[in-house]
Design a protein with these regions (language model features):
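Conserved core of the PLP fold type I
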Residues: 44-171, 175, 180-183
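N-terminal "arm"/small-domain region of PLP-dependent enzymes with the aminotransferase-like
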Residues: 1-48, 141
Length: 183
């Protein structure tokens, strides 16, 4: 077995799929670099973080007007959260449904945890084929549905009515993955 290697980009291509910046955050600000280094030196990085994350949850509730009754789950990036949610529903016969093409981790995690994976093709213009999605939900009764919004890798958004129709039809958990919402 050999280590995974990221292929070099062809000439003239720009990598946009990993939410990475080609610019170093401190390249033009030695002062900012020094401030970050000082803060990092004081951080207890030898300890696990507080699992309750109550301070962060309170800040998120205030910043985004999240009701106290709503649960907040935090993780180390969306890959971890997708994995945890998939593990949550993993049992024999359970299914995961996602639009295709979409973020590869939906299919990957379904396969890793032994879940059936149902990929519903997008239309030729990458819009959601809502009748096909609703038909697949009715036929397979997935425990988990992923809607990447805007879709990764196409960048196409779906209407609020379409997303709500998926939520209303799904018998299980619906994850609206807005990792690329800012883009």
């Amino acid at each position: 077995m050999s280590a995974y290697q990221v292929a070099a980009l062809p000439e003239g291509f720009t990598k946009l799929d990993a939410m990475e910046s080609p610019y170093h955050p401190f390249a033009h600000s030695p002062q900012l670099q020094a401030e970050w280094a000082a803060r990092l030196a004081e951080a207890p990085i030898h300890l696990y973080p507080n699992p309750a994350t109550s301070g962060l949850q309170a800040a998120l509730r205030q910043a985004f007007d999240i009701p106290a009754a709503a649960e907040i789950a935090l993780g180390n990036g969306s890959d971890e959260l997708i994995q945890l949610i998939t593990m949550l529903v993993a049992k024999p016969g359970a299914a995961v449904l996602a639009l295709e093409p979409s973020f590869v981790m939906y299919r990957h995690n379904a396969q890793v945890y032994g879940l059936d994976y149902i990929g519903v093709p997008l239309n030729d213009d990458f819009s959601m084929n809502l009748p096909a999605v609703l038909e697949a939900i009715a036929a397979h009764r997935p425990a988990l549905v992923f809607v990447s919004y805007p879709n990764n890798p196409t960048g196409v958004g779906f209407s609020r009515a379409q997303v709500q129709a998926v939520i209303d039809a799904a018998p299980g958990i619906v994850v609206v993955d807005e990792a690329y919402g800012a883009f």
